């Protein structure tokens, strides 16, 4: 069969479209994605659509983001004018702005410069859209920051502080009512938000805010929670959510949420809220949520696999940490039975060791004694890198509660000597090494110490001086150049500073340490860690005026090298080196004014008052023997010799 002949040109094109009537039923109906719905391609939750900014609006917020870098306080009138103009631009399109990458950054910055009224106005404009915002990437971040600022406003309202309200403002709702609007909107969907990748973070912040804890972040550091004053209705509402979760969720569901990467954060908040309510209440001491999760007496923890899961799961261990911090003492005994016989294995486990640290902080003397007896068998491994954190916490607990300090200190010393028999004790404990300096072009090697080991040594110096003297002696056995190197290293300098500041430090040790620095004070003073060391030497030389004179003379001789250095100039000012160079006699007088009391005077003044003795009263009558000789008066005062 012959094919139809093809003709060229637009008039005869086969791609010519024809008008076809299509009914509305044939179109695919696009629905709003359901909460928790997963994209089958990206495997991520589908985010609701909140609108987009026009290219001109996006360009505006990109430029504003760069402008806000130079504005750090609201005290400037230009800053206030800029903030007002930003909120005027945002008004009416809040959802589109907070869901934009540039707009969200601008909002996070401008919240720190905004007035309380502006923040409340913005928060109120989101009413009815909180559920959608919590499910978006940028919107959830903005909402977290916004909750932190709302917490500050609530705290001020509760304490009766003056808010920076604006004149002519029409919005009169309190921060309390605004937060409750948000809670009422999210409450029906909490079960779906619990393990949502984005919403779980917002839910955690909201629950802790209701419980009186506000998230605060300074710079790039990790956010921390501070206590604030909140209405009593907030805490009752927070507990009602926890109570509802305990009633409606099965134990298996709670445990599954505990090891979920996102839901675990909310479970931790639930536990905190429940135990804090238990601490406040005088009658109701029940903890139904925690009991269903783990603490019920019906559960045999030795036979319960969930306990092992919580101990060694990266996510679940955080829930167990919160439980260990707050559980009753009777439950700690149950936990001790689980740990007995395997303290060392759990303490060196990369995840379980964090739970063990929380447990040790609450342990009593008998529990610590059992632990130490078990650790004796692994004494050589006590100073392993993986065990240092637990060892530091254990010694810290012994120092705070004043038990087993001698036992543990000797155990650490013997373990270090056994593991490194030919190495100096101080060097062995700090795990000191020399590594190539990445910032140096000549291949210079610098001292590097283990940070946790430094913290352990600091804790070891807080034991009675009779014990810590052995550690100080090992430091002083090093060459002066090595001691100077430790004094200028970021981590180990804290140890040297602590030793110099010890009030009960032996005079011989103090002199030897100061002698090690002789000739290096100027070199030490121009480093960031060393400048603190030289300042602490002022305290260490209170009873050693000759040493103090030698130090200031060495700093004065270095001159501009110290005076105009960023760190050295602070030492120069604290030691008043300029006064020493200009008028040495005045400097000596000023130095003597700071001299501490002599030990003998301290002992005399600390003596108890004399009892059953008659104090001599000064008589107003003239003495009969005004011409008594000096010898007679001295004999009368001191007695017959």
From Swiss-Prot:
Ranges of Acidic residues composition bias in the record: 20-30
Annotated PANTHER family: NUCLEOLAR PROTEIN 9
Region feature Disordered, mapped onto this chain: 1-39
Residue windows of the Pumilio repeats: 89-124, 125-160, 185-227, 248-284, 302-337, 338-373, 477-515, 516-553
Family, as annotated: Belongs to the NOP9 family.
Residue pairs linked by disulfide bridges in the UniProt entry: none
Transmembrane segments: none
Function, in words: RNA-binding nucleolar protein required for pre-rRNA processing. Involved in production of 18S rRNA and assembly of small ribosomal subunit.
Gene3D superfamilies the record matches: Leucine-rich Repeat Variant (1.25.10.10)
Basic residues bias locations: 1-14
Main location: nucleus
GO cellular component, one term: nucleolus
Compartment list: Nucleus, Nucleolus
One of the GO biological process terms: ribosomal small subunit export from nucleus
Keywords: Nucleus, Repeat, Ribosome biogenesis, rRNA processing
Record-linked Pfam families: PUF_NOP9
Name of the protein described by the UniProt record: Nucleolar protein 9
Endoplasmic reticulum listed as a keyword: no
GO molecular function terms attached to this record: RNA binding
Species name: Schizosaccharomyces japonicus (strain yFS275 / FY16936) (Fission yeast)
């Amino acid at each position: 069969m012959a094919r139809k002949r093809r003709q060229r040109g637009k008039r005869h094109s086969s791609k010519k479209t024809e008008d076809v009537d299509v009914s509305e039923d044939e179109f695919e109906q696009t629905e709003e994605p359901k909460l928790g719905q997963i994209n089958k391609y990206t495997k991520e939750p589908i985010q609701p659509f909140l609108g987009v900014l026009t290219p001109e609006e996006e360009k505006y917020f990109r430029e504003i983001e760069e402008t806000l870098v130079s504005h750090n306080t609201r005290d400037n009138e230009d800053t206030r004018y800029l903030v007002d103009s930003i909120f005027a631009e945002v008004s009416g399109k809040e959802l589109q702005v907070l869901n934009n990458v540039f707009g969200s950054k601008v909002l996070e910055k401008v919240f720190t410069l905004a007035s309380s009224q502006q923040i409340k106005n913005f928060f109120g404009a989101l009413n009815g859209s909180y559920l959608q915002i919590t499910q978006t990437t940028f919107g959830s971040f903005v909402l977290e920051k916004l909750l932190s600022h709302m917490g500050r406003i609530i705290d001020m309202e509760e304490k009766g502080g003056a808010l920076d309200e604006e004149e002519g403002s029409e919005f009169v709702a309190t921060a309390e009512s605004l937060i409750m609007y948000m809670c009422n909107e999210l409450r029906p969907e909490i079960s779906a938000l619990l393990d949502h990748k984005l919403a779980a973070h917002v839910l955690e912040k909201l629950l802790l805010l209701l419980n009186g804890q506000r998230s605060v972040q300074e710079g790039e550091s990790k956010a921390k929670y501070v206590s604030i004053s909140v209405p009593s209705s907030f805490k009752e509402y927070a507990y009602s959510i926890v109570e509802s979760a305990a009633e409606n969720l099965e134990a298996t569901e709670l445990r599954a949420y505990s090891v979920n990467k996102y839901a675990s954060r909310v479970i931790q908040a639930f536990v905190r809220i429940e135990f804090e309510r238990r601490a406040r209440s005088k009658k109701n001491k029940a903890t139904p949520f925690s009991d269903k999760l783990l603490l019920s007496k019906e559960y045999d923890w030795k036979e319960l696999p969930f306990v092992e899961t919580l101990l060694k799961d990266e996510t679940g261990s955080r829930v167990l940490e919160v439980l260990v911090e707050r559980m009753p003492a009777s439950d700690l005994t149950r936990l001790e039975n689980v740990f007995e016989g395997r303290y060392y294995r759990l303490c060196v486990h990369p995840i379980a060791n964090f739970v063990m640290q929380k447990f040790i902080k609450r342990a009593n003397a008998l529990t610590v004694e059992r632990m130490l007896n078990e650790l004796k068998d692994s004494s050589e491994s006590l100073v392993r890198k993986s065990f240092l954190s637990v060892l530091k916490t254990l010694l810290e607990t012994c120092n705070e509660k004043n038990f087993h300090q001698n036992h543990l200190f000797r155990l650490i010393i013997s373990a270090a000597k056994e593991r490194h028999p030919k190495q100096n004790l101080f060097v062995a404990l700090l795990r000191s090494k020399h590594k190539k300096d990445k910032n140096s072009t000549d291949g210079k090697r610098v001292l590097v110490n283990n940070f946790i080991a430094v913290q352990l040594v600091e804790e070891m110096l807080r034991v009675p001086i009779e014990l810590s003297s052995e550690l100080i002696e090992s430091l002083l056995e090093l060459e002066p150049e090595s001691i100077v190197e430790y004094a200028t290293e970021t981590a180990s300098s804290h140890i040297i500073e602590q030793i110099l500041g010890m009030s009960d430090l032996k005079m011989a040790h103090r002199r030897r340490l100061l002698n090690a620095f002789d000739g290096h004070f100027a070199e030490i003073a121009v480093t960031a860690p060393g400048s603190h060391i030289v300042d602490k030497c002022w305290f260490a030389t209170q009873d050693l005026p000759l040493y103090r004179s030698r130090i200031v003379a060495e700093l004065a001789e270095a001159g501009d090298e110290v005076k105009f250095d960023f760190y050295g100039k602070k030492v120069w000012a604290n030691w008043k080196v300029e006064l020493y160079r200009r008028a040495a006699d005045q400097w000596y007088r000023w130095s003597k004014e700071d001299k501490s009391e002599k030990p003998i005077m301290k002992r005399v003044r600390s003596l108890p008052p004399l009892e059953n003795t008659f104090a001599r009263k000064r008589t107003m009558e003239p003495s009969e023997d005004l011409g008594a000789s000096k010898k007679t008066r001295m004999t009368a005062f001191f007695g017959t010799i």
